[in-house]
Regions:
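Domain-level signature for soluble enzymes in the chorismate/prephenate branch of the shikimate pathway
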Residues: 1-173
Length: 173
């Protein structure tokens, strides 16, 4: 992370998203870093604590921002979390937290997102909520503003759906 924030940036490690969230919401840190992969921190749906409207945590970036095609495995992708709304870049990806019953398939979610007009939906993470429900973190192309009209028809299909944040699409060199 030092190559993205500079060698003088101070950082501390936390073992759970709850700890990261507490440090940020208590203003002990300005940014949090959450792994994008199946890291043990992602066994619980941390994204369900994000609100589509109002103040609160949002994903504002994805790192690394510059990716080299010849060496794609240099570091793992991470989301940057902060107590601010993301800025629109013109080439963005938005993240949605979607909670459904266990019997709802990934293909059903992707199809519902496409039918609502969202482009290029991809499921990034899945975590069990309880014995009857699961939660997905999905990416769609474009910058979504709070209370995006496309979410209205989806609210009837899913137990819950909210905008978790947006980030500028990383550049491949």
């Amino acid at each position: 992370m030092q190559e993205h924030f500079g060698s003088y940036a101070e950082y501390v490690t936390r073992s759970s998203f709850g700890q990261v969230m507490t440090v940020i919401t208590n203003h002990e840190a300005q940014l949090g870093i959450i792994p994008c992969d199946n890291h043990e921190m992602n066994l619980k749906p941390w994204w369900s604590g994000f609100s589509s409207t109002g103040e609160g945590l949002k994903i504002i970036a994805k790192l690394p921002f510059l990716k080299r095609k010849e060496n794609p495995l240099t570091e793992s992708d991470v989301y940057v979390v902060a107590l601010t709304h993301p800025a629109q870049s013109g080439d963005d990806v938005s993240l949605l937290g979607i909670e459904v019953n266990n019997d709802v398939s990934v293909s059903t979610i992707v199809e519902a997102l496409e039918n609502a007009g969202y482009r290029n939906p991809k499921i990034q993470l899945m975590a069990k909520v309880d014995d009857e429900n699961k939660s997905y973190l999905a990416e769609v192309d474009g910058f979504l503003k709070p209370n995006d009209d496309g979410l209205k028809p989806l609210r009837a299909q899913f137990n819950n759906i909210n905008i978790v944040g947006s980030y500028a699409r990383p550049i491949e060199l």
